[in-house]
Amino acid sequence: MEIYNTLTRRKENFQPREPGRVCMYVCGPTTYNYIHLGNARPLVFFDTVRRYLIHKGYEVLFVQNFTDVDDKIINRAQEEGDDPLALARRYIGEYFKDADALNVRRADRHPLVSEHIPDIIKMVDELVKKGAAYVVDGNVYFEVRKFAGYGKLSGRTLEDMQAGARVEVDPRKRDPLDFALWKAAKPGEPCWDSPWGPGRPGWHIECSAMSLKYLGTNFDIHGGGYDLIFPHHENEIAQSEAATGQPFVRYWMHNGFITVNEEKMSKSLGNFFLVRDILAKFPPELVRFFLLSTHYRSPLDFDGEKMAAAGRGLERIKTSLRLLYEALERPVSEGVQAVCSRDPFDEIRASFEAAMDDDFNTALAIGAVFDLAREANTAVQRTGPAVSGQDRQILQYALDLFNEFNEVLGIFKVDGASGRLLIDGAAGDDSGLVEGLINLILEVRQEARKRKDWSTADRIRDGLKELGILLEDTPQGVRWKKQG
């Protein structure tokens, strides 16, 4: 298995610190708001990484933090007249609601900054004693130029960073590049006692202290979004290696940005989507499927047409599963000649593994799922009202592969009673089938609009309205919702 390592800028053969065991840390959200689509991508992707490592037989210790002490939280709490820590806890609860909807499994540990202040103070104190950090008026700063390897993750030189430093430099710093490890207390902000007076930790030191506490030095995988490479992860390396004298992380993994209609997602452009708003319009399995449909290091563009295309693809997989479930209920007759072969399914399984072994290429892995759907459909069509014992075993193998691939990709939730994949919503719920039919109808309407056949397009819209389905034509594509 190979992983692209941001630190070395190449794919490397994966060799964990301990054979058979993987320790991984992923930077979690700063909990001052509901999570947005950009937060959801690393959330879903690194959940998939963890799932695949377990599938490969590794024991995985997965840690994902919550930053519940931060300037953004303090500012938001002041706006709302709330306590910063209480506000952060509330949004942590909302985070789990969105994560659960996207079928993201809980980490083994979810450390909070506010519960690890002694660990953070201890690490800052160690850096001060080693001469890597200095104290000014109750603030503690890391002295960047004393760490020889600074810039090795981002590929930036000190000269480049110096040129890009802001004009307004904190006069308390010895160098504009130095960053805060501990911030002196300000009125109205949460603070804790420390050897340098009351204050709170800086952002970067939090992740270092918590990851080192639970995973130790030179742990296996540290993940996060591409935007965290600099300064956050660069600073994590500097302070961690200065404190311990040991390599911090073996493999650094970073996912690409999400764009909306090929523009960067931002509040100012009005294209900033919260996960829960998206989940109000699209089923969670489709959102997860879409997020995994592109290689994690590539940008992922979100728009209505791409979601509709992903929806059509997902419906093909659902249809194949429905056919398999139905075929496996047919009677077995030994008088029926076997017509199916296991070989194509073995090849598909190998191609899925090869895709995931190649830097967790979920896009190619999903391609293998489509191959499985096509081959399963062919096998079902070849069999009759009764199937041979051999063919039934092959059909069951096809279903087992769907389950195996889903255990890695996590697209569908699993019914605890039957073990079936929940492809149509909750057990006994046909909402998924209804949604698929509506999307097919909308596809026909879209084709009519392209032909400028407005009469047909309007007739479809009016017919759906009579059934309680309202359509909204937007620049991102057509959206629908149930009336009332």
Swiss-Prot record:
SMART domains: DALR_2
Signal sequence extent: none
UniProt entry keywords in alphabetical sequence: Aminoacyl-tRNA synthetase, ATP-binding, Cytoplasm, Ligase, Metal-binding, Nucleotide-binding, Protein biosynthesis, Zinc
Motif mapping: 'HIGH' region: 29-39
E.C. no: 6.1.1.16
Keyword Hydrolase: no
Keyword Cell membrane: no
Annotated catalysed reactions: tRNA(Cys) + L-cysteine + ATP = L-cysteinyl-tRNA(Cys) + AMP + diphosphate
Positions annotated to bind Zn(2+): C27, C207, H232, E236
UniProt cofactor note: Binds 1 zinc ion per subunit.
Subcellular location: Cytoplasm
Binding site for ATP: K267
Cofactor(s) the protein requires to work: Zn(2+)
InterPro entries linked to this entry: Cys-tRNA-ligase (IPR015803), Cys-tRNA-synt_Ia_DALR (IPR015273), Cys-tRNA/MSH_ligase (IPR024909), CysS_C (IPR056411), Rossmann-like_a/b/a_fold (IPR014729), tRNA-synt_1_cat_dom (IPR032678), tRNAsynth_Ia_anticodon-bd (IPR009080)
Pfam families: CysS_C, DALR_2, tRNA-synt_1e
Record's GO cellular component terms: cytosol
HAMAP family: Cys_tRNA_synth (MF_00041)
NCBIfam families, alphabetized: cysS (TIGR00435)
Subunit: Monomer.
Family note: Belongs to the class-I aminoacyl-tRNA synthetase family.
The protein's name: Cysteine--tRNA ligase
Organism placement in taxonomy: Bacteria, Bacillati, Bacillota, Clostridia, Eubacteriales
Gene: cysS
